[in-house]
Amino acid sequence: MESEGWPALQPLLCFAWIAATLPIIAAALPIPTAVGGHLLRRLLSAFSSRGKTVRPSPASSSGSSSSKAKFTVPQKYFMHFYVVGVLATTILLLAIWFYAYMKLTPLLLESSSYSTIFSHLVGSNSFSFGRVRSRTMGHKYRVWRTVFALLLMEVQVLRRLYETEHVFHYSPARMHIVGYLTGLFYYVAAPLSLASSCIPEAAEYFQGQVPEFVVKGRARMPDLVIDSSSLLQPLLKLGWTQWIGAVIFIWGSLHQIRCHAILGSLREHKDYDEYVIPCGDCFNRVSCPHYLAELVIYFGMLVASGAEDIPVWFLFIFVITNLSFAAVETYNWYLQKFEDYPRSRYAIIPFVC
């Protein structure tokens, strides 16, 4: 079911993710310098740089440093990503949850044995009836799966917003404006991708409610009564795939919390632009275990969503490529900055890169 104006949402999201991912993949490929490979890698490194990897070199002239500053923003603007993410995710979560509650409740399982007996008694037409009921049930599950996935996304952005304010102590370093805009795009497109299959029908539902409210008026509209148990019961009746995804998500989140606590403890003085080698937890194996945990988190979301919508796959592919590229850049920076940096560490994924 698709509302007018929304049928192109999924293709647009796929195109946006592909457009954001391809330059990263191209920069990672061994493209010869003669055809612009080195330039592409330098440009992408500059655009994606932040914090320690974007600071002007001490040998740079004052004019060069001033020019770089024009295209950068303070690294503490990371908070903007999560504010936007919370707003976008909350709006989508509340809208689709309300739509699912009003139109797709209760969520009940059909008895296969009852359907079989009924088909023998009534005849072959019952098979068509069963298929219709099956499609209806599948549609209900798809919408409630979306609510579940958006709940996980909401937990993620709320936690990251909290960590940005209370865990991380950002230095005076800066990040490139292109990376900043990419972050804003990401935290709008990610919840849209998770909800893309349900947005058209939810939008159609709300579009139908507005004229009804205008015609009838508030006094003649039925009172809205929300049963809290009906809000949660459909989520508890979802399949085992959703709960496996939730367990993966929770494991990745707990691991990332530990990694962020380690990183936050390295900079007790906010005004000092100084970096040290992080140690402990998986930092002893990889340079960016917090990025690895993020991959696990979004893999959990992918599993919990049912992994049926193409935009969610492109979202996950972007997360893999973007964080892998950033991890390699960070790893190379550590090697250049610290002579005693452990070269046995991988960038992000043990035994892979």
Curated annotation (Swiss-Prot):
It is a multi-pass membrane protein. Plays a key role in early steps of protein N-linked glycosylation by being involved in the conversion of polyprenol into dolichol. Acts as a polyprenal reductase that mediates the reduction of polyprenal into dolichal in a NADP-dependent mechanism. Dolichols are required for the synthesis of dolichol-linked monosaccharides and the oligosaccharide precursor used for N-glycosylation. InterPro entries: 3-oxo-5_a-steroid_4-DH_C, Dfg10/SRD5A3. The chain crosses the membrane at residues 11-31, 78-98, 175-195, 234-254, 291-308, 313-335. This is Polyprenal reductase 2. It catalyses: a di-trans,poly-cis-dolichal + NADP(+) = a di-trans,poly-cis-polyprenal + NADPH + H(+). Pathway: Protein modification; protein glycosylation. Disulfide bonds: none annotated. GO terms for molecular function: polyprenal reductase activity; polyprenol reductase activity. Its EC number is 1.3.1.94. One of its GO terms (cellular component) is endoplasmic reticulum. Pfam families: Steroid_dh (PF02544). It is an enzyme of class 1 (oxidoreductase). It comes from the Eukaryota. It is found in: Cell membrane. Belongs to the steroid 5-alpha reductase family. Polyprenal reductase subfamily. GO terms for biological process: dolichol biosynthetic process; dolichol-linked oligosaccharide biosynthetic process. Keywords: Cell membrane, Membrane, NADP, Oxidoreductase, Transmembrane, Transmembrane helix.
